[in-house]
């Protein structure tokens, strides 16, 4: 551990690295506090901060020669086969680590690789290459299966622990598997942190962007007080502030043959209201809507918009244009609404729900991977990051208030490389609730812009349903407003 005074140069380096964000670290008293320049406190500077050679230091760090936590079940013939770009990542990692060892720097690397790159299989290859006992830490149990599959393919002895770190510690007294796959809440147990710090050399933090290391979390404390010998952060959307804990980054661009289209489903709605809607509208400008909770609640009861989403999905699915669909909402009640209506239309053999409150959901996800046609309805929280269904070909985004990191992760669910190349996303920028009309339009525009500018999607307008739906007849004034609405939306984009 490095307890240092917060001198100007150190503070400036940290501030630059975090893009000017507030910096919080543990001080010499063990308090997690905001760092101020010229503070009289000494601060615990994370080991991974020094992994970059651009950070000047006289500190000397331990190397792998000081430990003997080697994998016993390694079999070189079981190493996974990698694509050329994945092999390039491995080559970069090995080259960087040689330099780190030579310079006596911490062996900490962030693998910033696009969604669908194959971070899991690439990291398993590196794990087998290093031959060191490994802890794989995931943010939720839904990610366990994809790691289990790849670790088993490499032939490594492993143990999975989802519930009850105390029972795991008892088992570890008699056996110490080569690979531990655990959920991050295990790191709240100090005895477990001490154990893996002593008996395991490599720590892999999957989906590292899901942790804000500027908060006093279990992962933050573990990396500060029980830093592993080697560490990988895996992410497609890194948090700038997390670089303080893992300051060496490898980012190799991925070229894709996927044909990616984002359909903007424009529609003009007559104003819609109910007593419930009028009650929630009163809360839009209050503190209870700070995180747009009521904005999303209003969307969930926007019946005309919900019906448009259903009509579009049903039309596309029945036509065979799309076959393996992910429907994403922000709120659980919104998810349940779509699930029940789709279940009535297509039945339980086709429609599935990704419910965080159902313990059987991970098993259900495994079972639908082999299906040719299905509709999977879930929430952004549960399926927005790390959902492992590579065959997904389409995504319906029913919510609107999503930050850039979540957008990129969500769109990545349909950007996995498979033999089928067409990928389609549907967004719905309109609402029948006039009080949130422009707000929703702006939020959805952010999704469209990021998908086109950063992720290579092609934007298209979708009007099949509105043009063919006999219920869409309207008065001349309504038609005029519809035209003006479309012009406004197109100019906005």
UniProtKB/Swiss-Prot annotation:
GO terms for molecular function: ATP binding; DNA binding; helicase activity; hydrolase activity. It is found in: Virion. It comes from the Viruses. Gene3D superfamilies: P-loop containing nucleotide triphosphate hydrolases. Keywords: ATP-binding, DNA-binding, Helicase, Hydrolase, Late protein, Nucleotide-binding, Transcription, Virion. CDD domains: SF2_C. The keyword DNA-binding applies. The keyword Hydrolase applies. Its main location: virion. Its EC number is 3.6.4.-. GO terms for cellular component: virion component. Residues 100-256 form the Helicase ATP-binding domain. SUPFAM superfamilies: P-loop containing nucleoside triphosphate hydrolases. ATP binds at residues 113-120. SMART domains: DEXDc. A motif (DESH box) lies at residues 206-209. It is an enzyme of class 3 (hydrolase). Interacts with G2. Might be part of a transcription complex composed at least of G2, A18, and H5. Belongs to the helicase family. Poxviruses subfamily. DNA helicase which seems to act as a postreplicative transcription termination factor. Involved in ATP-dependent release of nascent RNA. Forms a stable complex with single-stranded DNA, and to a lesser extent RNA. This is Transcript termination protein A18. It comes from Cowpox virus (strain GRI-90 / Grishak) (CPV). The lineage of its organism: Viruses, Varidnaviria, Bamfordvirae, Nucleocytoviricota, Pokkesviricetes.
């Amino acid at each position: 551990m490095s307890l240092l005074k917060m001198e100007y140069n150190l503070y400036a380096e940290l501030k630059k690295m975090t893009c000017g964000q507030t910096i919080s670290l543990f001080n010499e008293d063990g308090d997690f506090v905001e760092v101020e320049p010229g503070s009289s406190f000494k601060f615990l500077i994370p080991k991974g901060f020094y992994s970059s050679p651009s950070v000047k230091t006289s500190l000397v760090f331990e190397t792998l020669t000081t430990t003997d936590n080697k994998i016993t079940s390694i079999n070189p013939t079981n190493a996974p086969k990698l694509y050329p770009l994945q092999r390039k990542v491995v080559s970069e990692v090995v080259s960087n680590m040689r330099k780190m060892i030579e310079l006596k720097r911490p062996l900490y690397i962030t693998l910033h690789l696009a969604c669908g790159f194959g971070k899991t299989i690439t990291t398993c290859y590196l794990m087998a290459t290093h031959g060191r006992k490994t802890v794989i830490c995931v943010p939720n149990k839904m990610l366990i299966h994809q790691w289990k599959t790849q670790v088993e393919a490499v032939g490594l002895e492993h143990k999975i622990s989802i519930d009850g770190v105390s029972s795991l510690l008892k088992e570890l007294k008699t056996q110490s598997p080569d690979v531990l796959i655990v959920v991050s809440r295990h790191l709240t147990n100090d005895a477990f942190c001490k154990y893996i710090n002593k008996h395991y050399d490599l720590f892999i933090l999957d989906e590292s962007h899901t942790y804000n290391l500027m908060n006093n979390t279990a992962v933050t404390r573990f990396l500060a007080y029980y830093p592993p010998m080697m560490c990988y952060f895996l992410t497609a959307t890194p948090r700038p502030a997390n670089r303080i804990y893992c300051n060496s980054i490898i980012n190799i661009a991925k070229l894709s043959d996927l044909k990616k289209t984002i359909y903007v489903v424009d529609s003009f709605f007559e104003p819609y209201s109910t007593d419930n809607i009028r009650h929630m509208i009163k809360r839009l400008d209050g503190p209870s809507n700070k995180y747009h909770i009521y904005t999303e609640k209003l969307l969930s009861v926007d019946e005309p918009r919900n019906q448009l989403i259903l009509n579009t999905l049903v039309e596309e699915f029945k036509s065979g244009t799309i076959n393996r669909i992910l429907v994403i909402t922000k709120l659980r009640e919104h998810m349940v609404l779509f699930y029940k209506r789709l279940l009535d239309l297509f039945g339980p053999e086709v429609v599935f729900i990704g419910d965080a409150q159902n313990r059987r959901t991970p098993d259900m996800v495994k079972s639908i991977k082999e299906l040719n046609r299905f509709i999977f309805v879930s929430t952004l929280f549960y399926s927005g990051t790390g959902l492992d269904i590579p065959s997904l070909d389409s995504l319906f985004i029913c919510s609107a208030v999503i930050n850039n990191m979540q957008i990129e992760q969500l769109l990545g669910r349909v950007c996995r490389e498979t033999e089928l190349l067409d990928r389609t996303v549907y967004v719905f920028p309109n609402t029948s609730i006039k009080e949130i009309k422009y707000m929703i339009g702006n939020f959805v525009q952010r999704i469209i812009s990021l998908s086109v500018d950063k992720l290579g999607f092609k934007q298209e307008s979708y009007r099949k349903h509105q043009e063919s739906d006999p219920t869409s007849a309207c008065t001349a004034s309504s038609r005029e407003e519809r035209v003006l609405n479309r012009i406004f939306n197109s100019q906005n984009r």
